[in-house]
Amino acid sequence: GLEYWGARDLPFGVVGSVVKNRCLLIGDAACLANPLCYGGIGAAMLSGRRAVESIVEGRPERYSRWISKDRMFDPRFLDAHRIFSSWNDAEIIDAMHPFEKGYSVPRGVFAIFRRPKWARVYMGVFLAFRLGW
């Protein structure tokens, strides 16, 4: 029969160092999955490509610098994840209230002004949509 091996956590949030000696971490190994949607295939493919390019150029530090600066790995995603992962039902209802009739940039701006305590979440999600996550 089949054996159950369990599930594994999907790592996200950039690790301390993605380059060490002759080793470059990419994708899940570098914790590059998006913490809002857990998407990681695109990040893995793109980070693999960037890692190879930096190796071919003989400048692996460029790969590390790319990860620290690219908006794809913006710390606001992890910040938003940490906040909404701790929400209770009442907080979810409160945060989503401005979007009961749909989602749009004006509604997002309205939500930030009406519920500033959730502004970091709103901005993280907006950035994710803008970047195509």
Regions found by a protein language model. Give the residues of each.
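C-terminal auxiliary extensions adjacent to catalytic cores
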Residues: 89-133
